[in-house]
């Protein structure tokens, strides 16, 4: 009953090819510093994820109330 035109194997291979190479061995130090450090040190926060302040998310879009790059 799957409506997808992809078989699971095809989908997996497609995703494998599409994934960016640096992610395979974890994030590199440059990307880690860019993504992780500002979130943790400029925006100290402790609490449940659903109460995380939107303004701390750099790609949060206030108009659509969503985070850019995620469905």
Curated annotation (Swiss-Prot):
Interacts with the peripentonal hexons as well as the hexons in the facets. Part of a complex composed of the core-capsid bridging protein, the endosome lysis protein VI and the hexon-linking protein VIII; these interactions bridge the virus core to the capsid. Cleaved by the viral protease during virion maturation. May cause the middle segment to be shed from the capsid. This is Pre-hexon-linking protein VIII. It holds the Pfam family Adeno_PVIII. GO terms for molecular function: hexon binding. Induction: Expressed in the late phase of the viral replicative cycle. It comes from Canine adenovirus serotype 1 (strain Glaxo) (CAdV-1). Keywords: Capsid protein, Host nucleus, Late protein, Virion. All late proteins expressed from the major late promoter are produced by alternative splicing and alternative polyadenylation of the same gene giving rise to non-overlapping ORFs. A leader sequence is present in the N-terminus of all these mRNAs and is recognized by the viral shutoff protein to provide expression although conventional translation via ribosome scanning from the cap has been shut off in the host cell. The keyword Lyase does not apply. The record marks 1-2 as: Cleavage. Belongs to the adenoviridae hexon-linking protein family. GO terms for cellular component: host cell nucleus; viral capsid. It comes from the Viruses.
């Amino acid at each position: 009953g799957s409506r997808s035109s992809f078989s699971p194997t095809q989908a997996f291979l497609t995703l494998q090819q599409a994934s960016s190479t640096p992610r395979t061995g974890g994030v590199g130090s440059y990307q880690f510093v860019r993504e992780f450090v500002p979130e943790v040190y400029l925006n100290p926060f402790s609490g449940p994820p659903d109460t995380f302040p939107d303004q701390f998310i750099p790609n949060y879009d206030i108009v659509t109330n969503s985070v850019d790059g995620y469905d």
